[in-house]
Amino acid sequence: MPRPGKSSYSEQKPPYSYISLTAMAIQGSQEKMLPLSDIYKFIMDRFPYYRENTQRWQNSLRHNLSFNDCFIKIPRRPDQPGKGSFWALHPNCGDMFENGSFLRRRKRFKVVRAEHLASKSHQMIHYFHHPHNQTKMGLPPSEGSPVPSLGRLPHFQSYNIGNISGNQTSGFKHPFAIENIIGRDYKGVMTGGLPLASMMHHLGYPVPSQISNMVSSMWPHVGMMDSMATMTVPQEYGHFGVPMKTLCHGPSQTIPAVPLPIKPTASLPPVSAIPSLAVNPSIMCPSPPAVAGTLLEPAISQPENKSSMLHSVLVHS
């Protein structure tokens, strides 16, 4: 189909797409780039059909400029008068139209997204603002600001992971650490020397001789309690099977609060009934007589109260 002349499109719509009209205007310019206003002016001067309903087709043309890779936006230089950016054709889209005819567009031009957009923009500005480079079809190598590598951010400093871990472990204590689990009364003992060795000593685990000597020198009550014989438990309490150690000590000796673990037996036999409990003062810690008397008074006076109440009930009945 021969290319129609200018006079044959008087009032009818020309058979060109908006991409073809824009490319026609850009290629017809001297610098091969035009602002948006000059593209509108070229189309209206060449095709009288577009002199009406300007707002409708101009919106469509702007949409094609923004969403087609064959057009690139060139910022205006400070020394150039006017406002708005320039629009130009991508240097690699020369074969977009078949045989140079704007009526036949071979394919839609696509730019590979893997290209660095920053470097491409710099190359396009350099290409279109220097006329001696326009004769080349390929882009010149970029000389100037190097593009930073994608796999590395230069503004981040390298940190020593070993130092970070060391600082965190020295200043941070886990909430489930032994110092946080035990009560307040035991914190002084735990921070005063060898807490692990003392607890192993209480639990009966073998402790090296050096650590055992240090424990005995720092906490003499630990060896004292282990050396004292285990108290005898009455036969009626044999079902419970809980070994008890004497904790009595002299009034002049001060013993820090140390947790004493209790090791219950694996299984307990069923207890049908507990016999009458009798208080044996010999297994208790020595205490003043006045305190012992006050403790035994309720146990002695209880049978007398029961017998008097029974007698009063029989009399009134």
Swiss-Prot record:
The keyword Amino-acid biosynthesis does not apply. Residues 13-107 bind DNA. It comes from the Eukaryota. First expressed within the dorsolateral ectoderm, except for the organizer territory. During gastrulation, expressed in 2 ectodermal stripes adjacent to the dorsal midline. With the onset of neurulation, expression shifts first to the neural plate before settling on the bottom of the neural tube, on top of the notochord. Expression is then absent until stage 35, at which stage a pair of cells in the fourth rhombomere in the dorsolateral outer area of the rhombencephalon show expression. One of its GO terms (molecular function) is DNA-binding transcription factor activity, RNA polymerase II-specific. PROSITE patterns: FORK_HEAD_1, FORK_HEAD_2, FORK_HEAD_3. Keywords: DNA-binding, Nucleus, Transcription, Transcription regulation. It is found in: Nucleus. GO terms for biological process: anatomical structure morphogenesis; cell differentiation; regulation of DNA-templated transcription; regulation of transcription by RNA polymerase II. It holds the Pfam family Forkhead. SMART domains: FH (SM00339). One of its GO terms (cellular component) is nucleus. CDD domains: FH_FOXB2 (cd20043). Its main location: nucleus. Transcription factor. This is Forkhead box protein B2. The lineage of its organism: Eukaryota, Metazoa, Chordata, Craniata, Vertebrata. The gene is foxb2.
